[in-house]
Amino acid sequence: MWKEKVLEYENQMIEDLKGLLSIESIRDDSKATADAPVGPGPREALDYMYNLGKRDGFSTHDVDHIAGRIEAGKGEDVLGILCHVDVVPAGDGWDSNPFQPVVTDNAIIARGTLDDKGPTIAAYYAVKILNEMKVDWKKRIHIIIGTDEESDWKCTDRYFKTEEMPALGFAPDAEFPAIHGEKGITTFDLVQNEVTEDTDEPDYELLKFESGQRYNMVPDYAKAEVLVKENMTDVIQNFENFLQQNQLQGESTVDSGILILTIEGKAVHGMDPSLGVNAGLFLLKFLASLNLNKSAKDFVEFNERYLFESHFGEKMGMKFHTDIMGDVTTNIGVISYDKEKAGRYGINLRYPEGFKFEDAIDRFRSEINELGFNLELGKVQKPHYVDKNDPFVKTLVNAYRNQTGDMTEPYTIGGGTYARNLDKGVAFGAMFADSEDLMHQKNEYITKKQLINATSIYLEAIYALCVED
């Protein structure tokens, strides 16, 4: 029944999704204003969703242009559907323009198709279809739309300062059948205190190093500028050997006596950096083989001591595992060095329940202080957990099982979704076991089958929660 109903809306749903995907809704603080707190792109995407809601007869409510909601239904309790319309940077290597959606016979290709514009449109259409069926609502629905999920969550922080907290809700921003637990998440910077003067003349000077754009992405590109005072040919040959030994792609060029080295890696979501290839850490690994200036030497040796090939906090002394939530993970997402300003590592740490986070951070801070580094801690989000046997979770999972026949149990993840804003919130789709997970990667896409099936599941789940209940 539900899938047949969704198929009636397929063409319109894809057109609405294409419109949302065409908006380059990347956070841009350089263009932030009071009317666009995280930049014009996210604001445009937020307005786009409001306009869809108004077109379809829903009321909308804006919260300082950084978040808002589309309202449906009636009743005392509220079901929250927590979506986001901001996206991570596209990165390099796409086969098409990431913000000019390509629709094939089977799929839609663009940045945000999986994370989280495709699922947002699927959930929206589930509510739209039920509303146009003129069902007898027993609950209100707030489709809550954020614009800063990929960075600092300023959107939901602001929203829930003044707006009603849903009694229960889900975020369509992960996998089916349901995610009932999420690791704690924080970001922190490891900042080199000061530039150290050299007592001896170094053979090589690291002038500049850049890698990564987001703490929650594995960097797929790194670039270093090195002043080479002798043996330029040997350094280039050693670099080529390093690339070959590590099965990496990269380039070396010389510009006015400056050697420019680049490495390409593989970008993946920072919740499991072991699945990617961190271009920045590999390039630092090579630079450690050179007799660099003192500050640069200290910086690259820090990588070797604490970061390189240590995805689970082993070298930081933070290794920890639970059967329910898994391992601590550490993603080194943003790396920079400047000869005049020294260096900085930006890290995304995710940890399960039971990990003594504050103790671990305090110990590590003391340890690296002795090496000339400070730890600057950012926002901390504690682990989130809802019992998988809760009736709400069971209702969602039953909708999934009815539509798919798959009896997979709910599970926990290292990712963080808006679901953790709610006491009783879970992540619910929109990826399936056979979906190719290209979140935060090039050539991100959603299949038409996935879009239709996810919308059908949301239809049944929302009907069970807000009409039958």
UniProtKB/Swiss-Prot annotation:
Cofactor(s) needed for function: Zn(2+)
Active site: D86, E149 (proton acceptor)
Co-factor binding details: Binds 2 Zn(2+) ions per subunit.
Entry EC number(s): 3.4.13.-
Residues that bind Zn(2+) 2: H84, D115, D173
A Pfam family reported for this protein in Swiss-Prot or TrEMBL: Peptidase_M20
Family matches, as SUPFAM superfamilies: Bacterial exopeptidase dimerisation domain (SSF55031), Zn-dependent exopeptidases (SSF53187)
Biological source species: Staphylococcus epidermidis (strain ATCC 35984 / DSM 28319 / BCRC 17069 / CCUG 31568 / BM 3577 / RP62A)
Keywords, alphabetical: Dipeptidase, Hydrolase, Metal-binding, Metalloprotease, Protease, Zinc
GO biological process terms held by the UniProt record: L-arginine biosynthetic process; proteolysis
Transport among keywords: no
Name of the molecule in the record: Putative dipeptidase SERP1310
Listed GO MF terms: acetylornithine deacetylase activity; dipeptidase activity; metallopeptidase activity; zinc ion binding
Family under the similarity heading: Belongs to the peptidase M20A family.
